[in-house]
Amino acid sequence: MRVVSVLGLDVGSKRIGVAGCDPTGLIASGLETIVRCNLGADLDAIRHWIERRRAQAVVIGLPRNMNGSLGPQAHRIQHFGQQLARVIDVPIDYVDERLSTVQAGRALQSVSATRRKALIDQQAAAIILQQWLDIRRCQHRPTQESLDERHIDTER
């Protein structure tokens, strides 16, 4: 069995949630919440996680409008993805992240408000990554096959 390592990102204006998957590519879990500083520092922090986890791909949540269109925030996320692509050597994919933060908040309902604020972004990143992993499994596309395609998908 080949080991799979993919990172999921929930990119916000103040924080970036980071998630990773288990070596089988079945289960995503939160890793860290990066407090945004400046673009260079943000990209360095993500690059650190890519190197540390030996990530083969990065999945970024793309916040579509409820009608499926891309709004200003989605365009900012795509721009961030383009900047990230310039400094890393792994493919980037995008996943519709509508309501991932709402789902994350519900999942953390029993956690104290202070702790929830610290965890919500990484939980949202885990939801984004889990969605990506599940889509590949449902399409009967092994995660490794998806990684081998090495593309940047901005149409999803």
UniProtKB/Swiss-Prot annotation:
Keyword Hydrolase assigned: yes
Main location: cytoplasm
Gene Ontology cellular component terms for the protein in this record: cytoplasm
Subcellular location: Cytoplasm
Enzyme superclass (EC): hydrolase
SUPFAM superfamilies: Ribonuclease H-like
Entry keywords, A to Z: Cytoplasm, Hydrolase, Nuclease, Ribosome biogenesis
Hydrolase listed as a keyword: yes
Pfam families hit by this protein: RuvX
Biological processes annotated in GO: rRNA 5'-end processing
Superkingdom of origin: Bacteria
Enzyme Commission no: 3.1.-.-
GO MF: nuclease activity
NCBIfam families: RNAse_H_YqgF (TIGR00250)
UniProt function note: Could be a nuclease involved in processing of the 5'-end of pre-16S rRNA.
Family label: Belongs to the YqgF nuclease family.
Protein name: Putative pre-16S rRNA nuclease
Organism: Gloeobacter violaceus (strain ATCC 29082 / PCC 7421)
Lineage of producing organism: Bacteria, Bacillati, Cyanobacteriota, Cyanophyceae, Gloeobacterales
